Regions:
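Conserved CoA-thioester-binding segment of acyl-CoA-metabolizing enzymes
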Residues: 5-87, 108
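Hydrophobic alpha-helical scaffolding
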Residues: 55-58, 103, 107-110, 166-170
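Residues that form or flank phosphate/diphosphate-binding pockets in enzymes
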Residues: 56, 90, 142
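Short, histidine-centered active-site or binding-site loop motifs used for metal coordination
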Residues: 46-50, 102, 165
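Glycine- (often His-adjacent) and acidic-residue-rich active-site loop
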Residues: 84-116
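Conserved catalytic cores of soluble enzyme domains
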Residues: 110-112, 118, 122-176
Length: 176
């Protein structure tokens, strides 16, 4: 006779998958979503539909982060948790986006994307509300920058993080 498996929720852990429904989802885009997880706290979840295994940073993710920070600054919310329960946190920028901009000669698009990312990280860094990031597994390049600028980080014991742009032949911009 099969018996049901009884699952005990750790009282100190938050299962973010429980908040992924239409009632709690405030905005959803290609690579990220904003959820209201109660008690005046927002959650930004990364979930790239293009490369879900690594959640590469793209315009959609930046737009969601900007919108979440806008909501936070209204005063209706008192904190933001950036975390999800996928395979990897964020393995950095989608280098193919940069390659396409360079190949097409449209460097303004690339410059605008870099500037937008810098503006988002500065808003996270200087937010008067707490922004808690929860990186795990891969947090490379822009993924590292997202959590390095937050007011609080709750990192997984299994975290591989850093600025790996030099491996790609690029020089990271640390002029923050």
């Amino acid at each position: 006779e099969k018996k049901p498996l009884i699952y005990k929720q750790n009282k100190k852990a938050l299962n973010l998958n429980l908040y992924k429904n239409t009632k709690n989802t405030l905005k959803r885009d290609w690579s990220a979503s904003i959820h209201d997880i109660g008690d005046g706290v927002l959650n930004v979840e990364f979930h790239s539909i293009f490369v879900p295994a690594v959640n590469p940073l793209d315009r959609s993710m930046n737009d969601i982060m900007k919108h979440a920070l806008d909501l936070l600054e209204t005063g209706k919310y008192k904190g933001l948790v950036v975390g999800h329960q996928g395979k990897n946190w964020c393995a950095g920028a989608n280098v193919n986006d940069f390659k396409m901009a360079i190949d097409s000669g449209n460097l303004q698009v690339m410059d605008a994307g870099v500037k937008e990312m810098q503006e988002v990280t500065q808003r996270i860094r200087h937010s008067k509300y707490p922004v808690v990031t929860c990186p795990f597994n891969l947090a490379l390049g822009g993924g590292f920058e997202f959590y390095a600028c937050s007011s609080h980080t709750v990192a997984s014991g299994e975290l591989y993080a850093g600025l790996v742009e030099a491996i790609q032949g690029l020089i990271p911009d640390d002029q923050q």
